[in-house]
Structure formats: C-alpha cells, structure tokens
Amino acid sequence: MTIMRKTHPLMKMVNHAFIDLPTPSNISGWWNFGSLLGLCLILQILTGLFLSMHYTPDTLTAFSSVAHICRDVNYGWLIRYMHANGASLFFICLYFHIGRGIYYGSYLYKETWNIGIILLFLVMATAFMGYVLPWGQMSFWGATVITNLLSAIPYIGSSLVEWIWGGFSVDKATLNRFFAFHFILPFIIAAMAMVHLLFLHETGSNNPLGIPSNSDKIPFHPYYSYKDLLGGAALLAFFFTIVLFFPDALGDPDNYTPANPLNTPPHIKPEWYFLFAYAILRSIPNKLGGVIALVLSILVLALFPLLHTSNQRGLMFRPISQTLFWILVSDLFILTWIGGQPVEPPFIIIGQVASILYFTIILILFPIAGLIENKLLKW
C-alpha cells in the first residue's frame, strides 16, 4: 500500500516541501532563519488578528483603544507587546537571513533572491504602516515625514502625496487606509513566501561549501524539522525574555504621547530596523537624491548576482571577500547608530562616509575582491 502522504493531493504538497524534501547534509544553523521567519509571520498574523478586534482606526480613539487593549483586555498587554516586539524579531531574522544569503552566495538562485527582495520591501511597508497605527507622536510624525518623501518625485510628487494621505495632511483617511493595508499585507507576504519556497525547491538549498550536494542529500524530516524546532524554541525564549522583561527597550518613548500635529518631536526617527536606510537618506543634502539613495540601499541587493565575479560561490574560502563582508556588517551598525542621532557634526560626516562605504563595498570592492581571489588561486 502506498503511503497516504505521497498520494493525497494536499498532503503530497506538504510532503514534497517539508518531509521528503532532499536537503544537503551539511547546512548549518544559518539555514534555520527561513523557518524562523515563517514562525515570526504566523506569530504576527495571530497577535495582529486579536489586536484588530479591539483597535479602532480613528484619529480620536486610536491611541485610547491601544491603551484600552493594554489595560482592560485579558492579556491585552501581552498581545500588544508580542506584536510590537515581534516586528523587531522579524527584522532581526530577516537581516540574518539576507546576510547568510550574501555570505554563502545563495543570491545565485536569482528567482528566489529577487522574490526575497520583493518580500523585504513588503515587510518594510507593512512595518511602517503598523508603526503609524497607535497614533502616538512618533507614529504621526514618522508617517508625515516618510510619506512626504514621495513629493520629491518630479511633476506628480505633491499630487501623489495628497492622494496617499486622502487629504492635505496625515489624518483620519490616512490612518484608516494604513490599517486596511497593514491588515491585508501579511497575507500577501505569506503567499509570496510560498512562491519564494517554490522557487527554492526547484533548485534545492545551497550549502556552506557552495558546491553541488546532489550526491549527499538527506530527508528534511526528521533531521531538519527537529533542527528547526530547536531554533524555534531558542527564538521564542529570546523573544519572551524581551517581551516580559524589556517590552519598551526597542520602542520610542515619544510614542506614549498622543499624536499632536501642532507639536513636532525634537528628533523624528523610525524604528531601529529602518535606521540604516534613514541614515543613508539623510546623508544626501538633496531631497530627490536622498529618496533615490534610500530606495537603492535596498534595491542594490538585486545587483549581487550580476556583480558576482568569483569562481567560488560563497565566502567560505575567500579571506579578502570575508574581510569586506564583515566591514560591510560593521558599516551597517554604524549607519544604524547614525540614523538615531541628531543631524549635527560630527554625525553628518560619519553618516556620509558610512553611506559611501556601503555602496562602494557592494558595487566596487566585492567584484574586485572576487577577481583578485581568482587570480591568487590561478583560476
């Protein structure tokens, strides 16, 4: 008798994706982050669903409804802090996942990589709109500043901004539509993640050595299913430590003040996971130039497959490229720090140098290092 999981139309799909999937025998903990991102997404959709039952997308009551959730709803405080910190956790996993892709050359699976970039844009849009919903000071001013960037687009800019706002400023219409989009986007992200997985399973996973592993594959279950469970348990332990002991560590105190269009906060800044891009935006004195640099800071990831010059796939045996990779990581930490600082010396020049270094490493130094390493290995 044939096994049901191999014949049933629905179970067959699950079987091919999570049970009998041939997987390289040597993939490390860095390959855990895909499943951890799936866990984060499920967590965010569930907590978000329960929050939406008590939240009201109205300028007069939004802030109060969040306070009501924290004070009067059973475990509302827990759901709210899980959702708020879940976003941070999502981005931590996302950045590790992208870093792994760059380090081990996974970007050479072009379809998977490009869908990943689209997913990154979708997650960033969702997080930005979610940050606006509590209608605190930083919510309101963050929404005003970021949406205003679109006015830099020539000719249609100001009309586009007013169209997005639904009026002449960020107001009730804006909050309402942001809530609608914030609710629907995670489901679109889930669908895109399935497409991401579909394309990955066309080629099979990469591995730390960056060599074909068809001669040495093992079934995903039980080996990697249990490895993912361990990763998930570690992630949840870390997550609940933050949620239960330091729930406000990653947030902005300004968001505990209700939105006031007449009072601008001294330092308008986004959540920590956008600070590197915000620093790149601010380091260019021209508005349109800044917006282009902001978009390119993420879109530059799409150029990785085109700029790959090495005859080896990953950075495992390439010390020059490894050094550049870790300088790039350090540079991103510097940009994140600068994004949270006021626009004054010496932060301006540090931000500008770090921004130039970011693009220089990716666009110029990585390809040159690849060619040098080929030469050194006489390939």
From Swiss-Prot:
A ubiquinone binds at residue 201. Pfam families: Cytochrom_B_C, Cytochrome_B. PROSITE patterns: CYTB_CTER (PS51003), CYTB_NTER (PS51002). GO terms for biological process: mitochondrial electron transport, ubiquinol to cytochrome c. PANTHER family: CYTOCHROME B (PTHR19271:SF16). The cytochrome bc1 complex contains 11 subunits: 3 respiratory subunits (MT-CYB, CYC1 and UQCRFS1), 2 core proteins (UQCRC1 and UQCRC2) and 6 low-molecular weight proteins (UQCRH/QCR6, UQCRB/QCR7, UQCRQ/QCR8, UQCR10/QCR9, UQCR11/QCR10 and a cleavage product of UQCRFS1). This cytochrome bc1 complex then forms a dimer. Component of the ubiquinol-cytochrome c reductase complex (complex III or cytochrome b-c1 complex) that is part of the mitochondrial respiratory chain. The b-c1 complex mediates electron transfer from ubiquinol to cytochrome c. Contributes to the generation of a proton gradient across the mitochondrial membrane that is then used for ATP synthesis. This is Cytochrome b.
